[in-house]
Swiss-Prot record:
<dbReference type="GO" id="GO:0033202">
    <property type="term" value="C:DNA helicase complex"/>
</dbReference>
<dbReference type="Pfam" id="PF13361">
    <property type="entry name" value="UvrD_C"/>
</dbReference>
<dbReference type="Pfam" id="PF12705">
    <property type="entry name" value="PDDEXK_1"/>
</dbReference>
<keyword id="KW-0540">Nuclease</keyword>
<dbReference type="GO" id="GO:0005829">
    <property type="term" value="C:cytosol"/>
</dbReference>
<feature type="domain" description="UvrD-like helicase C-terminal">
    <location>
        <begin position="528"/>
        <end position="823"/>
    </location>
</feature>
<dbReference type="InterPro" id="IPR027417">
    <property type="entry name" value="P-loop_NTPase"/>
</dbReference>
<dbReference type="GO" id="GO:0003690">
    <property type="term" value="F:double-stranded DNA binding"/>
</dbReference>
<keyword id="KW-0067">ATP-binding</keyword>
<feature type="binding site">
    <location>
        <begin position="24"/>
        <end position="31"/>
    </location>
    <ligand>
        <name>ATP</name>
    </ligand>
</feature>
<dbReference type="GO" id="GO:0043138">
    <property type="term" value="F:3'-5' DNA helicase activity"/>
</dbReference>
<dbReference type="InterPro" id="IPR038726">
    <property type="entry name" value="PDDEXK_AddAB-type"/>
</dbReference>
<dbReference type="GO" id="GO:0000724">
    <property type="term" value="P:double-strand break repair via homologous recombination"/>
</dbReference>
<keyword id="KW-0238">DNA-binding</keyword>
<keyword id="KW-0234">DNA repair</keyword>
<keyword id="KW-0413">Isomerase</keyword>
<dbReference type="InterPro" id="IPR000212">
    <property type="entry name" value="DNA_helicase_UvrD/REP"/>
</dbReference>
Amino acid sequence: MGTKWTEEQELAINTRKCNLLVAAAAGSGKTAVLVERIIKMITEGENPVDIDKLLVVTFTNAAASEMRERIGDAISKALEKDPSSEVLQRQLALLNRASITTMHSFCLEVIKNNFHLIDLDPGFRIGDQTECELIKQDILADLFEDMYAKDDECFKDLVEAYGGSKSDDNLNSIILKFYNFIMSGPWPESWLKDKVEEFNINSIEELEGKKWIEVLKESIILDLNNAYSMLTQARDIAEMGGGLEPYLVNIYPEIIQVEELRIALSEGIVKFYNKLMGASFGRLKSVRKASVDDEKALEKTKSLRDESKKIIENLRDNVFETSLEEAVLGMKKMYPLMKCLSGLIIEFSNRYRDKKREKDILDFNDLEHLCLEILIDKDEEGNIKPSQVALEFKDKFEEVLVDEYQDSNTIQETIVGMVSRRDVENPNVFMVGDVKQSIYKFRQANPELFLEKYINYREFEDSNRKIMLYKNFRSREEIINGVNYIFKTLMSNTVGELEYDEKEALNLGASYGELNEENVEKEYIDEIENLKVAGDIELNILNKAGNKDYSDDELGEEEEDLDSIQLEARIIGKKINELMNPEDGSHYMVFDKDLGKYRKIKYKDIVILLRATKNWADTFVDELGTYGIPVYADTGTGYFQTIEIRTILALLHIIDNPMQDIYILSSLRSPIFSFTSEEFADLRLLNKDKYFFEIIKEVVDGIYDESISKDLKGKCKYFLDYLNKWREKAAYMPIDEFIWFLYSDTSYYGYVGTMPNGVQRQANLRILFQRAKQYESTSFKGLFNFINFINKLKKSSGDMGSAKILGENENVVRIMSIHKSKGLEFPVVILGGTGKQFNKMDLREDILLHETLGIGTNCIDVKKRIKYDTLQKHAIKKKCELEVLSEEMRILYVAFTRAKEKLIITGAVSDLEKSCENWCKASASSEDNRINPGNVLKGKSYLDWIGMALTKHKDGDAIRNVGNGDITLNLDDKSNWSFKSFDRSELLETNNNKKEKNNIDIFESNNWIESKKDIKEVIEIRNRLGFKYKYIESCNTPSNISVTELKRAHQEEEFMQESYNIIDNESSEENKKEKIKRKPRFMEERQEEFSAAKKGTITHFVMQHIDLDKVTYIDEIREEVLKMVKKELLTEEEGKVVNVFKIQKFFKSELGQRMLSSYKSGKKVYRELPFITEIPSSIIEKNLDPKIYGEEKVRLQGIIDAFFEEEDGYVLLDYKTDYVKEGEEEAFINKYKIQINLYKDTLNKILGEEVKEAYLYSFYLEKELKISKE
């Protein structure tokens, strides 16, 4: 029986003679539809199309192979039914010639067949990515050297503006970033020149009509709408009476003011700016709490009004931080720098192109650009037109089919346009994809290409037509309902770039039979009542704030150090064990399509999806392992950190250059040579100044025969003989052959195979061999260049990922990134790490790039040393932020839609109560069943978004109860959700129980040695386990210590001594008294957002950077802090915790006045001076024998808060923000005396004279405390 297609699928399969866009929702069977369309085109009708007359473009090589295989299978099955069909036989014969390919592969084919048209050597090859990166670095180095030699002033200003503080590396990175960005477009050089010319602006009037100005206006209107909505809500509450009427005096005119701002914006940016500068918010009328009926209503009204005020003030103070005249002047000022930068980029591009031609290599960017060069011509007026080659393709291809169209970029779109009849008679482009799954912005994918057609194509007969596939054949109804609820509530044109409405919603298409005796595995037929399927979507939240029934004193040191990743992994471990072995004795079942029945869940049915696996996956693997859960993480990282790869790379380093102590010690310590730590120490003691290699040569030459053992000399000779042999062979052997020779000659390949996880380790070594083989095909040769090649690979690609040895049917839980899961499906999906904040680091860069809006840069005045964002950068930054968050929304959609039967979500929050309050606040200020896009934009993580959405759900009581939310619910939704929060203490308890069990298991199996017959082996094992290092007393002495750590160590020592004295003096009756435990801070009062230590750090930062000319008045200090926030030196939240009154008190104190007097008289004032010095190790460890350790030094590092010069010497000052009780100043001084004395000693050495006075200044006490001389 054939596949039963839906009406929409039938249309997508059979519609012809038009450009057709198929918007295929997740799980809608788009690949099956695409294959069926191709099969019908090549086998049915009066004139079936030969398959080589179709161009099928897929996103990956794997997808192309799968497509070809599916088509081949379909033709073969048809031939079984009709063996005599000549049409089928012909299509099967033509299949290998068919253009079912990625865009890069198609471009390569075009170039190979037309190389003569672009003057390309036919012997070209595709350059290795790392090889190309090395060439780029060489070209950049030469380019910069040439520019420095020219002594060009504009170039020097460019380096000064963008090069970085210590080198020009940052400018290097900017050039590479620009180059990679512009190469994703069809006309890179012209794009660059056009966008640079936008800086050549002369008047305010020229701003109007700029694309980035329109985007800025869109961003502003979003803010104004939010402000207006908040004010109208505040008005509605106040108008209800209850004593809030006085607020209306302010609110009414402020609503009118925001409306006038909206009108002014519609009339142009200049009118809006003038109106904004005149906008003001008066002091809110005072309303006493005692006089109102509802205190919550008062707080909500006040909060809504204050939030709207902040929005308008942010527009005025941050977006328009300069006047429009200054904005125009700033852009004009940057024009020469941008022109110089674009010239550098174009010169780099030309040199790179020439170098590749010289080496006969192409990179992936070249494939698309050279293909386009072949496909286009220009007419007499310079307009683009198809070349003869392109016209031939237009005639050849009956249809061009593009899979995953939402991930196309602009240059690929241009190529498709050149080889198809999209814009001429007989249109023939078939595009299929889902814009909600466009998640490759980092590869310059442009979802707007899909959206433009999605909006303009029609759903009925037309030359440009669209068809919607909305039925999901993957997931259960429980999953579909959950997906629809979340994204109807959150996804919009603003965040997601598409309104998720009924038209976009998933419809149930999958048929999961009812669980009964007929469709369950035999062994479970008698347990039907005891079987479980599907269930609610689960949200599990880790509350990092902890459990209020536990104090910090009850947590051990290990527990204190546990981070949220480990704890979240434990939640997931518990959830997996609940699925695999429910405590109630039931069985969780999943439907197996191959069996056509329900079966018990297996580990391989479960996937853990993470936004990014780095720093997460390894921790998850370790933690889940303690639960006995088999798990595999496809991280794509960790390869270069494996012991086997590090060992071989260390060997290669010393073969290339043995004068590298770290690599030589690594090699000697490895199983290949088995040197011991004591032998290293003996070698080093022979000569402290020479390289180890030199010492080893001298040992072999017999210079130290009286000082070392024969065994050590024998080991050294063995090492040297092998090293000399390898160095000789490395000089003439190809690197890949040499590496395999090393594996064999050292027997290391066989050795790692006997280690735990040996198959994986050997596979990793084979990967290195294959990488060496790839290197041999590049233009670089020799061991030295191979090492550089590997080092560059580490930096540019991050890692190669461990070799994959896991089969698809291995029964393990898989951990993968959401990106890698795209196109896959799993019975159970656990979406982890949802509390991780969105990564917006790219938005902080000096230069932002946008395909449509151009270049966003700071205005930098090199001479005056000032820098601020241009208006254009504000616009581009806002647009990029919207695109980043829209992509995050789509990534979340991809994650949700991977689940077939069960979805479990986990995430962590710092403070559950505060998070729930924020979610409820966002929901309460949003109308209808949606969350206001402005509130969605405020979300910092997936968990924030999910939490906001669920406050409106009928199952969201748990969130609303904690967050005190008064919210209109969406009572019509069919999805079901369950919630559970986990406290830190609860998870620690679970782990301690596991540890106790493991310790018992180890204890019970600890008698194995006594059963061994080989006594020598037993003795050797015991000797190794009982080994004691001869300098054991020095092991606790660090090589490097900070002043703070040293101070703490002394305080602990004093505390311990005091404790012993107290214990000695206490009576036995006293000891029997119950110990009084300190009440945790979170039980006394709600935890502050910033710890005391963090606040202290912020205060120190302000004291370091504040302008000493502006510390007299509170307003001056407040303005200085605001500047630090604007420059992103402090976050807005950090700026709010700065106590400007305390800072003013310091500068008004006698000590502060002395500092200012020194500053104003031109004497030296230093702030935050870092230092490194050496002190005797005996200061740290007093029990060290001075005869042995007398000359041992420890490096001491610290930062001196401030010191200043007076007529008769220097004054040292250290700020403290600690809590201090009145009358306990002496104890406070003693606490820090050792620290201050160390600072004094250091300064005495630096200055060459004695520091005359030293002070502590307590911000808490608002007084200076003099440190007496010892």
